A protein has these predicted regions:
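Glycine-rich phosphate/pyrophosphate-binding loops
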Residues: 141-163
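Conserved acidic residues
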Residues: 112-113
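A cross-family phosphate/adenosyl-ligand binding-site feature
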Residues: 22-23, 27, 38-102
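Gram-negative bacterial Sec-dependent N-terminal signal peptides
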Residues: 1-20
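Active-site-proximal beta-strand/loop segments in catalytic clefts of secreted hydrolases
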Residues: 30-33, 57-62, 90-93, 116-120, ...
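Alpha-helix C-terminal capping segments
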Residues: 103-108, 137-146
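Electrostatically charged, flexible surface regions
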Residues: 166-291
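Charged helix-capping and loop-helix junction motifs
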Residues: 129-135
Length: 291
């Protein structure tokens, strides 16, 4: 009898181990385009269809360009809406949505991976600094979670601008499919108990708005360091200021940077750590300011 009980216990433990090994990858999706954005809702559906455990927490309204801003009001009650199963609309910024996802919805069962996007428009050059999409991913990395920011580019032609970027919206689903294929690749290489991506690093993907046959490949590249400013200001006689768009910023970027390679038809991979540290400049500052 004792042998039978011991055998049953071993089999039960073995079954539990198999279940643990087969536990689906848990993914938290966020964005800055809002909880109705098809770039993220469709990504949730596609990932869930592959068997992943996918949760989405996004701003209730479009928060594009809000960067890393947060709502800091302790005691405030937020009117969170549950839009669908595992999908929440949070009345705040992308960083707020991320925090609510990590420290609210999933606080007892954290995700294996955070994905921000797929964003409507590129996040290269200065746009990466402004981006709520990239900022949410960088915040996740700083917390210690593997994170991907995903965006689709623009074709900078007069026709595209006048018609509100039709190529971007046409190939938006393709960019989501690409992200799913990337998750599949990461998951296939993932060893249980270890991070799914290198610890402390995030990946910003920019996908060109082109048919797959015209995409030239993948190119790892740093974010453009000194981009043309997008915005200017005109000081008016009455003391007010009028914001203007710099026409130079609307021209297709060229050169050896993320904007240039995206515009050449490459999927760009830009790595980031979210640390805001630059210790390699210490010696230069010590020479200027002393120790």
């Amino acid at each position: 009898m004792r042998t039978k009980i011991l055998t049953a216990a071993i089999l039960a433990l073995s079954a539990a181990g198999v279940q643990a090994a087969e536990k689906p990858l848990k993914i938290l999706l966020v964005n800055d385009d809002g909880c109705q954005s098809v770039g993220t809702t469709s990504l949730q559906e596609k990932l869930a269809a592959k068997g992943y455990d996918v949760w989405m927490v996004a701003p209730a309204t479009n928060q594009s360009g809000i960067g890393s801003a947060i709502t800091f009001k302790t005691g405030k009650v937020f009117d969170v809406k549950k839009a669908a199963d595992k999908r929440y609309c949070f009345p705040g910024t992308p960083a707020d949505a991320l925090d609510f996802g990590l420290w609210g919805v999933l606080k007892d069962a954290p995700p294996d991976l955070v994905i921000s996007g797929v964003n409507d428009g590129p996040n290269t050059g200065m746009a990466q600094v402004n981006s709520g999409t990239v900022s949410a991913a960088a915040r996740a990395v700083r917390y210690g979670f593997p994170a991907i920011a995903a965006s689709i580019g623009y074709r900078f032609t007069e026709e595209e601008m006048k018609n509100k970027w039709p190529s971007t919206h046409k190939y938006w689903p393709d960019s989501g499919d690409y992200v799913v294929s990337l998750v599949d690749k990461l998951n296939a290489a993932h060893k249980p108990g270890s991070p799914i991506m290198p610890q402390g690093a995030g990946l910003s993907i920019n996908y060109p708005p082109l048919p797959s046959a015209e995409i030239k490949g993948v190119h790892y590249i740093e974010n453009e360091q000194f981009p043309v400013p997008q915005i200017g200001y005109e000081l008016l006689a009455d003391g007010t200021a009028k914001q203007t768009m710099n026409p130079e910023a609307m021209k297709p970027a060229e050169g050896d940077n993320d904007s240039g390679w995206l515009n050449k038809g490459y999927i760009t991979y830009t790595l980031f750590d979210g640390s805001w540290n630059a210790p390699h400049y210490q010696a230069q500052f010590e020479a200027l300011l002393g120790k």
